[in-house]
Amino acid sequence: NYVTGDASHWDRFSNWAETMPKLIGNPLYHWNQLELARYFNVFDLLGPSSAEKIYSHCNELLGKEGLSSRKLIKQSNVKVICTADDPCDTLDHHEKINKDSSIECKVIPAWRPDRAMMPEKGKDFISWVESLSEASGVKINGFDDFINALEKRHQFFHEKGCRLSDHGIETFYAENYKEKEIHSIFQKAISGTYLDEKEILKFKSHMLYIFGVMDAEKNWVQQFHYGALRNNSKRLFEKLGPDIGCDSIGDWSVAEPMSKLFSRLDNEGKLAKTIIYPINPRDNELVGAMIGNFQDGSVAGKMQFGSGWWFNDQMDGMIRQIETLSQLGLLSRFVGMLTDSRSFLSFTRHEYFRRI
């Protein structure tokens, strides 16, 4: 009721305030207090006794023009924001923002083509292919058309300033296949024909490779966020849908397919600059060691072990990532922290990282 329901703003806030003292040891406690301190000048600890006073103070500030979203971005010294965008997105808002001279921060898209790799989704995949056809202006009758449409959108994103891709995958895919098989699998997918697990994995393997080639040819950076086990509660998924807090850490075997994919791209001279974010901390040493195999001297730190992500985005997780990278690679070549939160107050997470 207090998250997705129709509870009032005050009821939501007061219940959160009641929860805060119970969060000692959880990063939410630090994040919340940092946000209150940096943006609202509140240094009291949020709890049941302070909730009403803090609520009134924050609402008063939010009602003033000085604490707008733009002000928060400027105050946080943000120079560039990358959004995660589906290949079918129009990017109209990016164009409007970048034409507005009053906005000092640059906002650029990032390519997030996850839905292009999900033939197992049946009707949803078919619907997405239709949307891709409309967005690209390419009539998609077969796999070659599908790739042509994606390449057109990739070029469109490039023209809009995109230099970064992001792939949310369960694991790395590197099955053996023949390209004619992929054409057949695609035809089955868009006709609504059942695909077995091997066909699905072969399709994902080829698409991950194709996207790697596209990124390398445009000198983009490719990112891989992998390992999440999603929608674990069937009950809540059927009631509320995806992305409602029922995702957790998976334990796929990843070393061999990761190596195989990178080796194929590297051997063809098509391995782009890469950042890898494992969700399972057991993979820290795996990733830290793996990236050393594919550094090629073209750019310092071409292969990156990304900062602690999701369940590792907290003090111990950050320390583990930093220590592993220091021991197995070069911390001096690390590209640093990122904030993948959807909140305009989340820039305090960079302070949290810097303190560590």
Locate the predicted segments by residue.
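Metal-cofactor-binding active-site regions of metalloenzymes
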Residues: N1-K218, K270-A272, I276-G288, G292-I356
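Catalytic core of soluble alpha/beta enzymes
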Residues: Y173-Q187, H206, F224-L286
